[in-house]
Design a protein with these regions (language model features):
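PLP-dependent aminotransferase-like
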Residues: 1-39, 49-52, 152-179
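Active-site pre-lysine segment of PLP-dependent enzymes
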Residues: 2, 9-11, 19-33, 45-68, ...
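Aromatic "clamp/platform" in nucleotide-sugar-dependent glycosyltransferases that forms part
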Residues: 42
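Acidic-residue sensor for enzyme active/binding pockets
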Residues: 73, 148, 174
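Conserved core segment of the aminotransferase class I/II
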Residues: 90-157, 162-166
Length: 179
């Protein structure tokens, strides 16, 4: 955002609200200069998982204001108390939606720089954006080839994170100790 001359405007996710954003407060922050709405779900560091109704409202806000919806879903497999996760892209057919994922969190491959982005929704409105992404990829990005080879085994191999997040799992136990 800053590299392109923009300014990030943050919306609050307060403890008293279960670390969930208030859609009305989010919409109140939108100005004519707003270009995108960023959603981080499941949230880090709180672990909050946004319910379907909240995601639908955020997607509707993005569509109403013709914003690009950017969804950081890197923690989609780290869910406590069997919280259901739903990708916002499934609810965002009327807007351009970029969803981001990767190996670093769920597959504990931090630092490998192996991730992906998927584009969905009103992709016909994203031609200029896609051109910019292709240009950026050609000029700036350098692939982590060994990490790319790890993608298929990581995604198809044994689940190593649920033992930490299910009831009695170390991560769940430790999160309950934090006040």
């Amino acid at each position: 955002v800053i590299l392109n001359g923009g300014r990030a405007v943050h919306y609050p996710c307060r403890a008293q609200d279960g670390f969930l954003p208030d859609p009305d407060a989010v919409e109140a922050l939108i100005t004519p200069r707003t270009r995108a709405l960023v959603v981080i779900n499941p949230n880090n560091p709180t672990g909050a998982v946004y319910p379907r109704e909240l995601l639908a409202r955020l997607a509707a806000i993005a569509a109403r204001h013709r914003l690009v919806l950017m969804s950081d879903e890197i923690y989609d497999g780290i869910l406590y108390d069997e919280a259901p996760f739903e990708p916002i892209a499934a609810l965002a057919q009327d807007t351009v939606c970029l969803s981001f994922g990767g190996l670093s969190k769920v597959h504990r491959a931090c630092g490998w720089r192996v991730g992906w982005m998927s584009l969905s929704g009103a992709v016909e409105r994203a031609a200029d954006y896609l051109h910019g992404l292709v240009l950026l990829a050609a000029l700036r990005l350098c692939s982590n080839v060994p990490g790319q080879w790890a993608i298929v085994p990581a995604l198809t191999g044994p689940d190593t994170i649920s033992a930490l997040t299910r009831p009695g799992g170390l991560c769940l136990v430790e999160t309950q100790v934090v006040p």
